[in-house]
Regions:
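Cofactor-binding active-site loop characterized by glycine-rich and histidine/acidic residues
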Residues: 30-171, 385-386, 414, 418, ...
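Thiamine diphosphate
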Residues: 91-103, 127, 131-134, 140-145, ...
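A short glycine/serine-rich beta->alpha loop
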Residues: 16-25, 53-61, 104-116, 345-349, ...
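Terminal amphipathic helices with adjacent charged low-complexity linkers/tails
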Residues: 53-54, 240-249, 253-333
């Protein structure tokens, strides 16, 4: 029976890829046995309840092998992946896109495809499960109790982010993380002997992982024994499974020819004969469906039913905790954050927005028990520390400060995994200039609709002495270009509070907070509530103004000072604080006209970053005071003056406009 089901997985993949004339059959054919074993013997999922929070998670880190996952989901009974959807693989509007997409297809636990990120994301799943189990489980009531499984390939393990995350997972002793390594000695360009020769198991042993070798990737009993051994090891586990890419293809197996191209009709026919598969394309024997129903769907439904009874009993035994758990199950925060939770701030109060952020995130941490995060070895510079808690590790699972180490990319992907798991609000910090290290993770936050908060400090050339390697220039423009990402650069402590509030209330959009090292003064006109609009009027000395200054972050203080100088010269000026261009762009036309009336063409935008994004606001008649070169090393006041960020220069630019 098992051989028939394994071949059903293979040929669903082969046939769908042939029909699409696009895809990667090699991994489907080679990894089918381990995937079959995982789904029918280990993975505890319920196709009728695909979002069950205590299900085991499965991450196909080798996302190019998506038909392996779709075949498994179809056979297991997930409604989203009907046979029609299998036949529509890689077609417009289908539930079976080229790489798995979270939120698009039920049963897909994470968006994968960029290699390495799946392993790192799985690390976040495992850490989320551990925290929630420590917080809410009680004797006899293991409400959160599941494993996270991964299938990865050689390419995943070559990527640096998997190494960062594996080092971190070993440090954290995340023992419910099990990675199955599809080790087939082939990559797209040829054989791995030309590009990847270290002992992966030795490397992972050094990270603090349990490792094992299955020498025959078709030996289901050996695979099963290795998984059971891994689960009992008390460590994260890597099981190297030696496979043959394109297994069963007489002329292509074991070569890179089967990695990323359809088999074609002739080789498919030969493979059918070689594997004894006497069925038409997309024809699946009833016995295979029965196998998956009994060993995946029915087994999972029984586990789900037992768990729901456990939760009901838990509500009786622990009603206060159960109320929080019920909110988590429903996808809500266990406690609601409100604007009134943040203290009022006096005008004129001066503080760096990184410090304002520290104050605000501690307000959030006090209110929300499931709010946690950390920094890439910069907590005391990013000001990301929750003051009531210590560091989280295996011995202190309830602490909410996470020390990611100098692993920015892994930090972003781990945060994604924690957010994907559900039940948590998470954040991570580093210097803004180092956001490039984790930009690929930020992009996947946005693509997956995950409300992760990124805290990026030291936001401009005002860093000063550290010089151009540490002074962001192009970073704001780059992050603003990512769809479904809200970038906030607050002007003062009040706007920083509001930006944090917007971040925590977000459901489907990640947030970037871009914060200063230098002190900024709370302006009289900044407004907590209006930050929700992305831009608003912060200063105006006449209702018939003829000049608009648009500024973000630290430049709002500069713009207001320049406006007051212009006012003393008889100028009529409006200053607009635009903490988030993304949020402002989403407002309706009427609000945009209210803030930036088309009739007023005399406009200047002020921001210590690349200028290109600002011309859509100032137009051809306006001007931009920005930076399109790298920064410099000197005291901040000298750097700012040399780059023209002074009241005198800004007034001059405005007066030179027609």
């Amino acid at each position: 029976m098992s051989n028939l089901s394994v071949n059903a997985i293979r040929f669903l993949g082969i046939d769908a890829i042939n029909k699409a004339n696009s895809g990667h059959p090699g991994v489907v054919m080679g990894a089918a046995p381990m995937a079959y074993n995982l789904f029918t013997k280990e993975l505890r999922i319920n196709p009728a309840q695909p979002n069950w929070i205590n299900r085991d998670r499965f991450i196909l880190s080798a996302g190019h092998g998506s038909m392996l996952l779709y075949a498994l989901l179809h056979l297991s009974g997930f409604e989203d992946v009907s046979m029609d959807e299998v036949k529509n693989f890689r077609q417009w509007g289908s539930k079976t896109p080229g790489h798995p997409e979270f939120g698009h297809t039920a049963g897909v636990d994470a968006t994968t495809g960029p290699l390495g990120q799946g392993i790192a994301t799985a690390t976040g799943f495992a850490q989320a499960e551990r925290f929630l189990a420590a917080k809410y489980n009680r004797e006899g009531y293991n409400i959160f109790d599941h494993y996270t499984y991964v299938i990865c390939g050689d390419g995943d393990l070559m990527e640096g982010v998997s190494s960062e995350a594996a080092s971190y997972a070993g440090l954290q002793k995340l023992d419910k993380l099990v990675v199955l390594y599809d080790s087939n000695d082939i990559n797209l360009d040829g054989e791995t002997k030309d590009s990847f020769t270290e002992s992966v198991r030795d490397r992972y042993n050094a990270y603090g992982w349990h490792t094992a070798l299955v020498e025959d990737g078709t030996d289901l009993e050996a695979i099963q024994a290795a998984i059971e051994e891994a689960k009992a090891s008390g460590k994260p586990s890597l099981i190297e499974v030696k496979t043959v890419i394109g297994y069963g293809s007489p002329n292509k197996q074991g070569t890179n020819a089967v990695h990323g191209a359809p088999l074609g009709s002739d080789e498919t026919a030969a493979t059918r004969q070689a594997l004894g598969w006497n069925y038409e394309p997309f024809e699946i024997p009833a016995e295979v469906y029965a196998d998956f129903k009994e060993n995946v769907a029915d087994r999972g439904a029984s586990a789900y039913e037992a768990w729901t009874k456990l939760v009901a009993d838990y509500k009786e035994a622990h009603p206060e905790l159960a109320a929080e758990v019920e909110a988590i199950i429903d996808g809500r925060d266990p406690v609601e954050l409100t604007p009134d939770d943040f203290p009022a701030l006096e005008n004129g109060f001066s503080q760096a927005t990184r410090n304002s952020s520290q104050d605000a995130l501690n307000v959030v941490a006090t209110k929300l028990p499931t709010f946690l995060g950390g920094s890439a070895d910069l907590a005391h510079s990013n000001m990301t520390y929750i003051k009531t808690d210590g560091l989280q590790d295996d011995a202190n699972r309830l602490n909410r400060n996470i020390q990611f180490g100098v692993r920015e990319f892994a930090m972003g992907t781990v945060l994604n995994g924690m957010a994907l798991h559900g039940g948590l609000r998470v954040y991570g910090g580093t210097f803004f200039v180092f956001s490039d290290y984790l930009k690929a993770a930020v992009r996947l936050s946005a693509l997956q609709g995950l409300p992760v908060t990124y805290v990026f400090t030291h936001d401009s050339i005002a860093v000063g002495e550290d010089g151009p390697t540490h002074e962001p220039v192009e970073h704001l423009a780059g992050l603003r270009a990512i769809p479904n990402l809200n970038v906030f650069r607050p002007a003062d402590a009040r706007e920083t509070q509001a930006a944090w509030y917007q971040a925590v209330k977000s459901e489907k959009t990640p947030t970037v907070l871009v914060l200063t090292r230098q002190n900024l003064t709370v302006e009289e006109g900044t407004d907590f509530d209006k930050v929700a609009k992305g831009a608003y009027v912060v200063y105006e000395n006449a209702t018939d103004f003829d000049t608009i200054l648009i500024a973000t972050g630290s430049e709002v203080n500069l713009a207001v000072a320049a406006a007051k100088e212009l006012a003393s010269q008889g100028g009529k000026v409006r200053v607009v604080s635009m903490p988030s261009t993304d949020v402002f762009d989403a407002q309706d036309t009427a609000y945009k006209e209210e803030i930036l009336p088309n009739a007023v063409r005399r406009r200047v935008a002020v921001e210590m970053g690349a200028t290109q994004n600002w011309y859509k606001y100032v137009g051809l008649d306006g001007a931009v005071l920005g930076i399109d070169t790298f920064g410099a090393s000197a005291p901040a006041s000298k750097v700012l003056a040399e780059y023209g960020f002074t009241v005198e220069n800004l007034v001059k630019i405005i007066n030179n406009l027609k």
